[in-house]
């Protein structure tokens, strides 16, 4: 099994275990005020994973991070620092924002 296959297997196992929990969190906890934020994070996720060999699994993992980021930002009343911190967490390659 090569490195990419091992990585995919690891991500699949990780995602199977936590996906339903994140789905429930997203359904019940993220309000409509976060919708525009989610669109921004969706765009960042797409840009970050478009050239990845394991892009589908990477994207699934980042979507779960996105849910957590939206919850974090919402709990901090959409503060500017909380938003920048969450965006940097999801997309650490974007340095000009921080």
Curated annotation (Swiss-Prot):
Recorded GO CC terms: host cell mitochondrion
Transmembrane segment boundaries: none
Source organism, top-level taxon: Viruses
Subcellular location: Host cytoplasm; Host mitochondrion
InterPro entries from the UniProt entry: Rotavirus_NSP6
Main location: host cell
Assembly notes: Interacts with NSP2 and NSP5.
Protein name: Non-structural protein 6
């Amino acid at each position: 099994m090569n490195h990419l296959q091992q990585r995919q297997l690891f991500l699949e196992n990780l995602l199977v275990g936590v996906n339903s929990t994140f789905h429930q969190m997203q359904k019940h906890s993220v309000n409509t005020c976060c919708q525009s934020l989610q669109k921004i994070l969706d765009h960042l996720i797409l840009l970050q994973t478009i050239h990845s060999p394991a892009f589908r699994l990477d994207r699934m993992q980042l979507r779960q991070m996105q849910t957590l980021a939206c919850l974090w930002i919402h709990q901090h009343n959409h503060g500017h620092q909380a938003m920048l911190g969450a965006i940097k967490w999801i997309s650490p390659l974007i340095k000009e924002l921080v």
